[in-house]
Amino acid sequence: LHRRRHSFPTRRSSDLMHLRKNKAKGVAINGLPIRKARELLGVVNLVFFSPEDLNIIKNGPGERRRFLDSELCQLDGVYITELAGYNHIVNQRNRLLKDCYMNPGLKSTLDVWDMQMVDYGKKIIGKREAFVEELNEIARGLHKGLTGGIEELEILYEPSVTAAEFEDKLSRNRERDLRMKLTSVGPHRDDFCVKVNGIDIRRYGSQGQQRTAALSLKLSAIELVKTMT
């Protein structure tokens, strides 16, 4: 057993974290074992840099949603519960959509899932929108500094549907969802656009532009963690 000790400053005190090698459940704070990842929320806030950060820009919407959710979960302890609840409902709804193909009588039960999905979804949309706005404000200044003022970065939230329209669009898409056997609208299909000098660099940016933009995003996330925790 190899044990390493690291002291992390928090809002409450200087907590002692133990990381144990080769142990699936090898994290403890002040001697108390951490059994769920969510227990670390609000205790230790980390922004990790890696070569894979470039994927935030160049890969698909799923990568960018993971970035948003990862950062929001650090800043908002309730968000992880809302996100887990929403994802559970989407999975259950998709299963029900498939079951409706063989048993059309189950269609009436979709209303219950839709109501819960809209409730969770509106909260997620609102928090993602606010986070992207904050991120954009910080990233613009940081990016100008990184590029010597040559490039102007803009980050725009691209929700699958607005919070105000979610309930109506989910209802209007029901027949389509039944045919496709999946849920076609909601935060699980969100994205955000990254522009440099007005050009969408997700599709048309050079690797250098994408790398610098990804760095700006991560540095901005650090600033948000510092100011909001």
Model region roles, listed by residue range:
Residues 7, 11-63, 69-79, 136-141, ...:
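Nucleotide-state sensing region of NTPase/ATPase domains
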Residues 57-59, 78-80, 88, 184-189, ...:
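Short C-terminal domain-edge/linker segments immediately following a structured domain
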Residues 101-229:
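Conserved NTPase motor "head" modules and their coupling/switch loops across ABC/AAA+ ATPases, GTPases
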